[in-house]
Amino acid sequence: MASGSSDSLETLSPPELIGLVRRLIGEVERLGKENEKLAAGLASAKRENQELKDEIRRLKGLPPRPPMKPSGMETATDRPAPETPSAAEATPPHRRGPGVSKLSVDRTVTLTAPAPAGSRYKGYEEIIVQDIAFKPEVTLYRRERWATPDGRTVTADLPAGVVGGCGPNLHRLVLTLHFQGQMTCERIVAVLTAAGVAISKRQVVRLLTAKLDLFRAEDEAVFTVGIRASGYVSVDDTGARHAGRACYTTQFGSDRFTAFRTGPSKSRLAFLRNLLGGTALYAINAAAAAYMRAANLAHGVIDALLSADVLEFGSEAEWTAHLAALGLTELRVAPDPVRVASEAALWGAIAAEDRLGNSVILSDDAGQFHVGDHALCWVHAERLVHKLVPANDKQRNAIEVAKRMIWWFYGSLKEYKLAPSPQQAEVLRARFDRIFKRGGTGYVMLDRLLRRLFRNKDGLLRVLDRPEIPLNTNASENDIRTLVTKRKISGGTVSDKGRDTRDIMLGLAKTCMKLKLSFYDYLGSRLGLPSPPIPPLAGLIRPAPS
């Protein structure tokens, strides 16, 4: 029966009205489902349209569109500073810019004023003026030469710090401009040439890689002490082309040090090799056995490795030969016994040498970093919720509710770090379960994501047991940004020496900044210049709090 007019509805019997209402409800449900499909199709079309726009920008050589804006969780959960009007009123206004009280005056110049007759003398108005004398200094070294009775020639040595016709001051300036100032070799040559220095690009490159062994030893010492004594190691990685091939740079850092390591892979094997340092050591011990059991390696393989006559190997070749002798290289099963056993042996060597000490590894949930005592970044976890694309208002509201609950919980974790207690830790664990264990939000993708984050409970709540570790990897991303800037300006590296120089010098520059040291003074101290002496950086990295 048609439902065209209100008059016809009045003549309907109750059963007919019920049938009509049921048909209308079915029609509304059909239209609602169709609307959801259209909304989902519209969202998909928008994504495809944006992908096409990005591809057009790439083909035109234009810069890519900026990434998704951050949700603002970090700033929104910061505790506001207490208002102290009386203290603010008592504080005198400051002039902008760095203070001049730390400067030492090299000379004093008295300026006279053309005062007319009858003027009264009122003393001096003192103004500090800074200037710099940037000019080349050319020195002719006349080296004595002596012919010994046995036919040899003895020549006087050049002063320490002279490299290829360039003095230590020029060497320090080139290193500072390139690694801290992020200037290319061509621009350094242009600046120095304009100032009157006769220098070529080849000489600049030679200065950048000179005395690399000195800085490499200090970088290794900083890395060894930093990952063990800092209490935590925040890690991240990024792409870095080397010798025309795609490579990856891994960042290691804390609030006291930074180190970079570049290699052809970002697998867990590569990460463990970096943690182990420059030594190639494989050890089958209790830590390695626990690793293999956690990876679900076959018990027969584990028993064969544990019962072998040799349990430590000093090179990759020896370890590979041992795996082949046990027949593991011929197995085609999952998980791969060669890969898992190699990871376990490297982890066993790290544990045997106590490379990490009591440090926690903090990461963005990338799989290669999931080793040892591990913590996860809350900003990356919340970002997964922030990046969901809702198809209707119901899904949008579900996302907003989940985000607000995560924000409140993140703020509570910040407060916990200031005053940790076992009682509050249990309360926060219960709150975590209520937020991430719940279901039925009305948005399937959100429900799956919350369950995934709940499975990461141990890593996300590591801060309850170790309140000294950060809640995010923002510091790692800041360190990585230095390398990304260098990559955008200079491109990739060609030689292994150039790659190592970049990693070492950028890491030392960031370490000096975190230790509140002048990288310029540090270079002067290491190059033998009369600058403030700076002790070994590894000794300045404070031990982890007990």
Residue ranges and their predicted role:
Residues E29, Y141-A147, R152-S546:
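Catalytic center-proximal scaffold of phosphoryl-transfer enzymes
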Residues M1-G165, V205, V235, Y282-A341, ...:
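Short, flexible loop/hinge motifs at secondary-structure junctions
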